[in-house]
């Protein structure tokens, strides 16, 4: 039983080591690649965590499949039942957290669509009457395509060129389906606490991705930087910053985003940065795959141990 617990402990501790590596990797990559790396790492690490707990939870059931009496297994491994129950409790907590968070996403999305019922439509743009300066990408819902939602207060706060940047930014969110990446990372954070910081970092890189696409659309990085800054200053902070399907122009560290836009266009890493990026990619991928391999190895080890006990007649 000691080896089984060691395998599970290693699988559960891996995200604490892999998450910082994923965050460092994201800083070396352009926004698009950084967003994909963070999302993929979060999902893989969360999956490894769930797989390890499932493997630990069904140890007594494997004994039953091998036609071993549970009393004999408990006599051999006294901790098997309480440890399995603890794993089951952890899985139940994860299931509740995932359900509540997913339901929260759906409720927020439905509520946002409800608030646009009286909006003026112009193609993919919905203009909502209101003094508050608001702008966000509204994903599709129940067969309705995604829309860019902007308040009249936000439109009045920006000049024509700045409005073009704002609309290009929000359209980039819709076109890239960034809400799916954000939701995947948010749900992964509900599985393992070490992944919560990845979701926060992902918010920044998704906004940087949209910022760069907006700058390319207007072909003027300084205008894009000015527009992002003015829109963020005019708008109110999002109620649930980065924790749902609505991505807003004032999400994330705006000063850092503006400084990035005032600098050169992001490029793929070269030289030492490229070597560091490759090393970090390998480390994060290895950690995620190791978590899955540990979960599979746990299953195989339990089956082997059960067969050995049966063959030697110890249970």
Cite the ranges covered by each PLM segment:
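Short acidic/histidine-centered micro-motifs embedded in hydrophobic/aromatic stretches
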Residues: 40, 187, 227-231
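Cytosolic-facing loops and C-terminal tails of multi-pass membrane proteins
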Residues: 2-4, 11, 80-105, 233-315
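Select subsegments of transmembrane alpha-helices in polytopic membrane proteins
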Residues: 40-50, 279-280
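Loop-to-helix transition at the N-terminal end of transmembrane alpha-helices
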Residues: 30-44
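N-terminal signal-anchor/start-transfer transmembrane helix
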Residues: 6-26
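Juxtamembrane extracytosolic/periplasmic "stalk" immediately C-terminal to the first targeting helix
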Residues: 29-33, 66-70, 110-114, 302-311
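Transmembrane alpha-helices and immediately adjacent membrane-cytoplasm interface residues
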Residues: 47-111
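Polar-ligand-bearing catalytic/cofactor-coordination segments
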Residues: 22-34, 83, 87, 95-182, ...
